[in-house]
Amino acid sequence: MAALAHIAMLLVLGIVAASALFNVYAYRGAARHRRRHPPACAADGEDRTPWPGRAWAFAVECAATALLGLATPLALRRRRVRPLDPDDPRPPVVLLHGYAQHPANFLWLARRLERDGWRHLYAVAHTPVGGDIERSARRLGETLDRVRRTAGASRVDIVAHSMGGLVARAYIRARGQASGVGRLITLGTPHQGTEIFPRFRLDPMVGQMRPGSPLLARLAADDPVPRLADCISIYSADDAVVVPASRGYYPGAFNVEVRGLGHLSLLFSRRVYALVRENLAAERAPAPATAAGGAPWPR
């Protein structure tokens, strides 16, 4: 028993150490990019957060990364799809994780939504590493078809984190009017790419998220997605994974910039949750615009 406790403690310490090392790498890379491209970053607003705020964002991001690493076993849980309740008109909400992540990322956000009355929430898995975003989009389509069919719903809403937003966009673009997606809310999605791993060549998914990649060019070409679904992009000026952070801006969508939050911290933020809840509950579509500081689009 004592040996198992020691192994568990070593595992926890290893996850915490790995989380800290990854974030040191990411934040140093983001700072290096700011130094190399100061005019663009200043124009994009990435230097508006004072250094104490960035230091706090780093500490919270380390904690969020470690917490999600420890939550990995919970990703094995599966929620059964249920028919819609006649007295609840809201569509099912599908939660889509990002690169190298898992469905358990949404445990906190899903619990808050359940507490506020959402009954049909489904965190789905897709290929987290070593795959292809468009192939993941096809698998997502099969999952959404099953959710709509079993729930008896004509549409679903999607809340996607990081790369999950690109998977959702690829799916909606491929299916067009038949996608059945009413609203797409993305959190920290690199809509215009990210330069966090400029020299990493082992995983093709990372290459697909580089600025100017063939995939991003296809998604951006006469992008029909904002016309097919209500699109809201929530991104942080202090995101060290989406580099520069302004690449979280999604042309054609309603964009909300927040500050003082890292990439994974977006999933635990009360400010971000309030935006997600309000935008899921709102009835009319947002106009393409940008709201600074976290103001939701008007009802």
Model-derived features: positions:
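Short, amphipathic alpha-helical "lid/cap" segments that border enzyme active or binding sites
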Residues: 63, 137-141, 269-277
